[in-house]
């Protein structure tokens, strides 16, 4: 926040450290970005910080994502050789529907009952423990300048750029969907414009030109990514669109950009598994690197009521969890965002935040599977489907004749 006015007459001024009211330093580029010269961390040996005791309970301790250790500077990420960095973007000033997604990152972190880093996080579907396979950290939240969209988006881009430059995969907790514009641009800055593809799960196309009268909106990020050249239209795969927007003119524009779009009508007709197979093939077709953008409203409001623009008739929670894991395992991802979780509209059981939390865990499992070379389509461990090591039914009971 800027404090340009004179504070000499502020009766609290003498209680603050020298320089407290000075304009914050602008974020730098690459590894000279956020945190690189943080006064609180100056002189500290780089590496991960562990704010929780080992195996801390789910609802105790300090609520980092899954009680992960903390990285505060790019140097921490590099020194610890972090594979996955979870970070929040608590921003909803570009939402046009119900507000509250600025509280999304906190809710996604705090809803988890699973317990702490150091406990087993074993996937029953795959028998892969991402927390054992990967070095992961919570990187805190991007800097936000309330009321200043241009500055905030610049800072988001640079903040995420520091993560990508360090070699870690950013998993981004939104926030409204407009943050995908600076976030995916940061990824394209690193890997090259035109080299990144996006699989976009959403009830809405988010390809508007301006909504309402503003270029920066949660209904416009995909158009801006295409128009800038960061992510060409042919590198977009969209899944789950339904409802009453966009209009034909925008759909024609999407076709002109060669976007691949799978509407709920196709999913209902052919089944989610077949459509997901098409999406995986399309994701492998064009781009060298894959970014997943998950708007939680792709799921039916029965599974995700806590969102700004709910649309009935969506996919199930099981559909999205499997889809995210499959893409991360079979294709491999370089970044992911989960956006549009609005805690004020969630139910008492926090099912929307918990679904977002589990989608991230499935992405982590998929990343670990990809690193292990477990990339066969729709892999499930034999034990999870009732088989023993030889492929026979486990503990089978034979009926008497």
Where in the sequence are the language-model features?
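Intrinsically disordered, low-complexity repeat tracts enriched in Pro/Ser/Thr
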Residues: 8-12
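Conserved alpha-helical scaffold segments that buttress catalytic/binding sites
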Residues: 3, 13-401
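N-terminal acidic, proline/glycine-rich, low-complexity intrinsically disordered segments
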Residues: 1-7
């Amino acid at each position: 926040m800027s404090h340009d006015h004179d504070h000499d007459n502020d009766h609290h001024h003498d209680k603050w450290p020298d320089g407290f009211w000075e304009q914050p330093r602008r974020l730098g580029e690459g590894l000279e970005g956020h945190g690189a010269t943080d006064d609180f961390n100056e002189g500290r040996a780089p590496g991960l910080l562990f704010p929780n005791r080992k195996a801390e309970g789910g609802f105790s301790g300090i609520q980092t994502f899954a009680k992960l250790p903390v990285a505060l500077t790019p140097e921490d990420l590099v020194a610890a050789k972090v594979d996955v960095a979870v970070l929040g973007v608590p921003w909803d000033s570009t939402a046009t529907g119900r507000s509250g997604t600025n509280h999304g990152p906190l809710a996604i972190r705090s809803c988890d009952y699973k317990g702490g880093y150091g406990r087993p996080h074993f996937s029953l579907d795959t028998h892969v423990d991402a927390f054992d396979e990967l070095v992961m950290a919570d990187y805190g939240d991007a800097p936000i300048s309330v009321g200043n969209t241009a500055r905030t988006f610049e800072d988001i881009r640079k903040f995420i750029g520091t993560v990508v430059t360090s070699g870690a995969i950013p998993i981004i907790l939104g926030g409204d969907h407009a943050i995908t514009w600076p976030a995916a641009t940061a990824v394209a800055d690193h890997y090259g414009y035109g080299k990144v593809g996006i699989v976009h799960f959403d009830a809405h196309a988010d390809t508007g030109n301006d909504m309402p009268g503003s270029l920066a909106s949660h209904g416009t990020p995909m158009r801006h990514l295409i128009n800038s050249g960061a992510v060409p239209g042919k590198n977009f795969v969209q899944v789950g669109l339904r409802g009453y927007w966009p209009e034909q003119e925008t759909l024609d524009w999407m076709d002109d950009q060669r976007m691949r779009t799978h509407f709920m009508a196709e999913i209902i007709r052919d089944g989610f598994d077949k459509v997901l197979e098409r999406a995986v093939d399309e994701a492998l077709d064009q781009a060298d690197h894959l970014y997943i953008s998950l708007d939680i409203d792709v799921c039916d409001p029965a599974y995700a009521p806590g969102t700004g623009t709910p649309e009935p008739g969506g996919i199930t929670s099981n559909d999205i969890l499997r889809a995210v894991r499959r893409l991360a395992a079979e294709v491999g991802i370089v970044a992911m965002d989960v956006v549009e979780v609005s805690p004020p509209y969630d139910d008492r059981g926090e099912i929307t935040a918990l679904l977002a939390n589990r989608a991230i865990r499935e992405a982590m499992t998929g990343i670990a599977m990809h690193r292990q070379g477990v990339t066969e389509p729709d892999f499930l461990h034999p034990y999870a489907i009732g088989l023993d090591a030889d492929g026979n039914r486990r503990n089978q009971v034979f009926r008497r004749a």
